[in-house]
């Protein structure tokens, strides 16, 4: 039986990736296996693998992070912490009944945060 899905995301520079997710997004670094990282925030878990040839400006990697409550507070906290919101990713209600905002990590991965309206 499948318990949950855990995304595996690429990184170019481990230090920049850890600093971004831990210092800016408030994730916890759970494990560091050299070229493989595991981080978590609340019930979300992300795995990261080294991908030296990745071009952030051409990355097609993206994930959707479901927010259970207070997406406005999370959005405001990230802005206060200096997290750059994607120019097309300001907090807004979408036609698919989700309130969303988006950011791009240092590796070019699009992170969309969403909560049902």
Describe the role of every protein-language-model region.
Residues 1-3, 55-60, 95:
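Short glycine-enriched loop/turn motifs at secondary-structure junctions
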Residues 1-18, 63:
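N-terminal beta-strand motif that seeds the catalytic metal site of vicinal oxygen chelate
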Residues 7-10, 95, 102, 113-117:
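Short beta->alpha transition motifs characteristic of CBS
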Residues 14-25, 110:
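Conserved active-site alpha-helix within GNAT-family acetyltransferase domains
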Residues 24-29, 83-85:
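Conserved acetyl-CoA-binding loop of GNAT-fold acetyltransferases
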Residues 28-61, 66, 110-115:
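Conserved short beta-strand elements that form part of the metal-binding/catalytic scaffold
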Residues 63-110:
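Vicinal oxygen chelate
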